[in-house]
């Protein structure tokens, strides 16, 4: 509990100065006049990418700590599941096209609406789609699926990428754990997803076979 409160406070205190630094650097970058292929331009691009990663890390720490400390509240309302998936596909279409990856939406007809925080569920889907794109080879396929199962709706993101080793699957939702060969972020994304789904009264899980792909799913109550 003490550690969670410390992380929350530290993340909050870090965000303001780092945001200011990022804005100041962005202004400098706009005004700097270096040839596009120069070493200086490459260095500016590298600094910009690393500052964006730092901002993402701080935001992930802050958001995760808010959930851990019970400070995050949901803004609940009617949520159309098919629209949720279609909008998620739209946000990632450009990235998928750049990798020649097909994004499919497969939603059961006449799904009932969820009573949920749509913004938070979008955050979960964005994280899962980002992971799927990172671990799927060019020319692959990712499916966004939804179906009703009793009094729950099962939403899943399934890819035909590299899969996850069996020995890593048990810890995949723990904070600061990264799996697979391609690392990214601080390993907080899936832990945050699990917190969001649990706050909705749902549960989250994973099915994966190494070399054959991965399916992350969330089971949300109606």
Name what the model sees in each region.
Residues 189, 193:
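Short alpha-helical Gxxx[C/S/T] motif in the catalytic ATP-binding
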Residues 1-33:
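Primarily the dimerization/phosphotransfer
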Residues 81, 163-171:
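Short helix N-cap motif at coil->helix boundaries in the Bergerat
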Residues 75-80, 97, 102-112:
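Conserved catalytic submotifs in the C-terminal HATPase_c
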Residues 49-54:
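Short alpha-helical segment of the dimerization/phosphotransfer core of two-component systems
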